[in-house]
Structure formats: C-alpha cells, structure tokens
A protein has these predicted regions:
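Dynamic "connector" segments at or just before major functional cores
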Residues: 1-214, 235, 239-246, 267, ...
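An anionic, glycine-rich sequence signature occurring as long contiguous blocks
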Residues: 2-16, 31-35, 301-410
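Structural motif
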Residues: 109-120, 379-385, 434-442
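Short, conserved catalytic/metal-binding motifs centered on acidic residues
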Residues: 123, 138, 167, 213-218, ...
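Short acidic, glycine/serine/threonine-rich loops at helix termini
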Residues: 224-227, 286-290, 311-315
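Electropositive, glycine- and tryptophan-enriched low-complexity nucleic-acid-binding patches
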Residues: 224-273
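Domain-level cores of phosphate- or acyl-group-handling catalytic modules
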Residues: 259-304
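Basic, amphipathic alpha-helical segments enriched in Lys/Arg and hydrophobic/aromatic residues
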Residues: 407-486
Length: 486
C-alpha cells in the first residue's frame, strides 16, 4: 500500500500580517527604549560634566585668589629687598665711578704701585667718554690730560704738587692684567644700583606692561682671544642699559651661561614679576622653568626650528578666534605691518612647554621701495616680503594683552639699536683690534659703562653727548658722578 500523502498546513495571510506587525512594534519599542537609555546616559554625563566644571571653576577661582595673594606678598617683599640692596650697592660703590672701580681687586703686588687702579680706570673711561676708541688714542689722551681732569680722576701727585698721568705702558699693562670678570661684575652692580628699578605692580585692574629685561648675545668682531677665537658676550639690558653680562667660553654657547648670569643679577635686585625675553636659541624648557620657578619672572620666547614639535603644534592651531593687534611703521623707503594674534595656550602646548599660558602668531609684512638704475634711467622697484613668527609666553590674558606682547617683542629687538649699534658704530667696538689678555673684555665693559652712564643721566643721543663732553668738563664730571676739588 502506498503511504497516505498529506499537504503541509500553510498559515493564513491574516496570521502573517499580525506576526509582522507585532515584530515591527517590538523592534520600535526596543529602539525607543534604547533611545531613552542613551538620553538618560547623556543627561547623566552632561550633569557630571557640569558638576565637574563647577568644581573645576571653584578650584580655579581659589587657585587664582591664592596666586594673587602670593604675587602681592612677593611684590611687597621685592620692594623691601630692592630698597635694602640698592642702599647696599650705593654704599659699596661710593656713589661715584671711582668708587665703583675701588671694588675691583688690584692684580699688582703692593710694592711698586705708583698709580691706583681706580684712577687709571677712571682716566680710561674719561678717554672713552671723550670719543677715544683705540688703545693708542686712549693712552695719548691720558698723557695730555689737564691737571683738573687728572685731579678729578684721583691721579697721583708728583714733585711740585702736580698730578702725574700714568704712562701708556702702565695703562696697557693694567688693562691686560685686571680681572675682566671682576670689573664686569662691579660695573654691572654699579649700573644696577643707578638704575633703581621699581618692583613690578601686580595688574589687578587688568593687563599692563611690566619691567622688561632683554637677553641677547653679541660677537665683538674686532676682539680676538689669545687662542684666536672671537669674543662673545651675553648681555641683559633694560632701557638700553646693560645691567649684566657674561663672557661665553670658546667651546660652548649661550645656553648654559644665561642661567648663572640671571641668578647673579637676581642677587643685585629681584627679578620677580619681570618679563624676560631672549632669542629662539633660549626657547628651552630649562630656561622657562628657571624664569618662572627660580626667579618668579615671566618669559616671552620666539619658537623656531630648534623646537620642531612645539613649532609644528603652534603652526597647526586654529587662530580664527584669537585676539588681534596691528602696528604699522614707515620710514626710509620701508613700510612694515605687524599683525599680532594672541590666544590662550591649549592643553597640547602646555604639555610641550612648561608654564605656557598664551601663544602668539606674528605676521610681518615688509614693503621696501628702492631705485635701480641701468645707466640710462632710474626705475622704482617695490619688493614685498612676509614672515610668520610664533611665540609662547607665561603671561596670562589677565596680565598681558596682544598690545603688551607686541611691546615686549619690539622692546627685545630694540637692544640691537640701543646697545649693539651704540657699541659697534658709536664706540667702534667692531673696529677695535685690541686682542691681548683681558683688554678686549675690559674695554667692552667700559663701553657698556659709557652708554649706561649717559642714559642714566637723561641723555638719549650717545654720539652727541660724547661730542659735548670733549668741550664740557662739567658734563664729564656729571656723567662720572664726581665733584672735583676747586
């Protein structure tokens, strides 16, 4: 017998439709439930973020209040320490330039001294103040100096009561023997005491300019050490006056020398609250830590290729919302526009560089107009160049705005005109061929002292003042802060 064949039972259309509808409803309910759970999680996260921001904001306000109190206390301490140290320096230096030189140890033995070291150095400085730039010119001027000038310098009294100038050989020998570093420290100490800087005011009312110290190195091209290497000096200047300098050894550079120089300067007057600027060579984590942690100061530093990671991070930032400041200069056939964009340092920059609070981008556009001739006619030529520079600073937006950052940048580059140009051109340092012993460094120090004395006396034109001293003894005495016996 054949097995009985049965047809499979097929669900009816109505049952399928109901099942599909139930599945759709179930899935929709699951999606709605998942959406509700996500919404609840997002709400919880948002609430947590708000609570965290509130706690962070309260913590930040508390930290700001503590920082304000700390800075206020430091400013009060700085005022007291500054007044005390200024009084000590004035007492030590005697108030006059010969008193400053009296603090320099005499390298000669006690026997056979005919001319005191302060009198010889004062006469050399007089010659420099009267425009003598070579060793031959200095010794010739001293040999023919009048009795009143010799007496004012403290030269020895010879037979018949006449003042005797030191010989050219004595002057040359002493300049080669004197401790160049001791002389530089005494001069820097004296200029720092005369500068009498005010302690920085804490900018409670808003951003404001603070005292500025520019650090920059210079090669004395004409001066050569006994080993044949050039003389390099690292200087710290404020207001065109060198208040600290340090010789760079032949087998190193400025980086390991700037820290000891600033620490020594800090012993003369506190640098807390000052703004330190330096070129891109010193854009180092160690320098930033030294400025902010050891000195209590701030920094404004240029970022270039020696910090590739930091430079790339700054170049990759979005500057659309940055605060802006623009300056324009015109003169000598040149127009220069500088656009400064400043904003708070993001977290990635703070992770790369210590104490970074703000970052800046400066776009310099320079247009130079000149005339060129082909022998028949002159043609006016205009050339335009653009340069982009990045900077990092420890100054917060509360302490410095874009206009203040711009002022610190310009103030740093003014060292070229106020210090280096004066020494190179007016005092002819690059043309000097003095090479033996400590003479190059000693005369470089006396050139710094010359410019510093003139500026501290209220004269801005160094060259004109030097010309005037040639015919005005009273002006010379005033610059040296001495009162001659009449």
């Amino acid at each position: 017998m054949h097995a009985q064949f049965r047809m499979p039972v097929m669900p009816d259309a109505a049952g399928l439709a109901i099942a599909e509808a139930e599945e759709v409803v179930r899935r929709a309910a699951e999606r709605e439930e998942a959406r509700a759970r996500r919404k609840a999680r997002n709400a919880d996260r948002q609430r947590c973020r708000q609570e965290e921001r509130g706690r962070n904001g309260a913590d930040q306000r508390e930290r700001q209040r503590a920082e304000q109190e700390r800075l206020r206390e430091e400013a009060e301490k700085a005022r007291a320490v500054l007044a005390e140290r200024a009084a000590e320096l004035r007492e030590k230096c005697g108030g006059s330039v010969p008193g400053c030189f009296a603090a320099v140890p005499d390298p000669r033995g006690r026997r056979g001294r005919r001319h005191s070291l302060p009198s010889v150095l004062t006469l050399v400085l007089m010659a420099v103040l009267r425009g003598r730039t070579t060793l031959a010119g200095i010794t010739a001027w001293i040999a023919h100096a009048g009795q009143d000038l010799l007496a004012a310098a403290g030269a020895r009294t010879g037979a018949g009561g006449r003042r005797q100038p030191p010989s050219g050989r004595t002057v040359t020998r002493l300049l080669g023997m004197v401790g160049a570093r001791a002389l530089a420290e005494a001069v820097a100490c004296y200029l720092a005491a005369g500068q009498d800087p005010e302690p920085p005011a804490y900018p409670l009312a808003g951003p404001a300019l603070q005292p500025h110290l520019a650090c920059d190195g210079k090669e004395a091209r004409g001066a050569v050490r006994p080993d044949g290497t050039s003389l390099f000096l690292l200087s710290a200047a404020t207001g065109g006056i060198v208040v600290a300098d340090r010789e760079i050894p032949a087998k190193t550079n400025e980086i390991p020398e700037i820290g000891p120089m600033l620490l020594e300067l800090n012993d003369r007057f506190p640098l807390a609250g000052w703004v330190l600027t330096a070129d891109a060579l010193h854009t180092q984590r160690g320098f930033a830590a030294l400025a902010c942690e050891n000195l209590g100061a701030h920094y404004v530093l240029t970022v270039k290729g020696n910090q590739p990671g930091l430079h790339a991070a700054l170049a990759g930032l979005c500057w659309a919302g940055a605060r802006r400041h623009r300056t324009r200069d015109k003169g000598h056939g040149r127009r220069e526009t500088r656009s400064h964009l400043v904003m708070d340092a993001p977290g990635e920059i703070k992770a790369l560089f210590p104490h970074a609070a703000q970052v800046a981008r400066v776009i310099r556009t320079r247009t130079v107009t000149s005339w060129k001739s082909n022998g028949k006619k002159r043609t006016r030529v205009t050339e335009t160049s653009t340069e982009t520079v990045y900077l990092v600073t420890s100054l917060t937006a509360r302490e410095a705005g874009p206009e203040h950052i711009a002022a610190y940048i310009r103030g740093h580059w003014s060292v070229e005109n106020e210090v280096h140009y004066v020494r190179d051109v007016t005092l002819r340092e690059d043309a000097s061929k003095i090479r033996a012993g400590s003479r190059p460094r000693a005369l470089a120090t006396l050139r710094n002292l010359t410019a510093g004395l003139i500026r501290q006396s209220g004269h801005d034109d160094i060259a004109a003042t030097i010309r005037d001293t040639e015919y005005d003894n009273d002006l010379l005495y005033a610059l040296l802060r001495i009162t001659p016996d009449l």
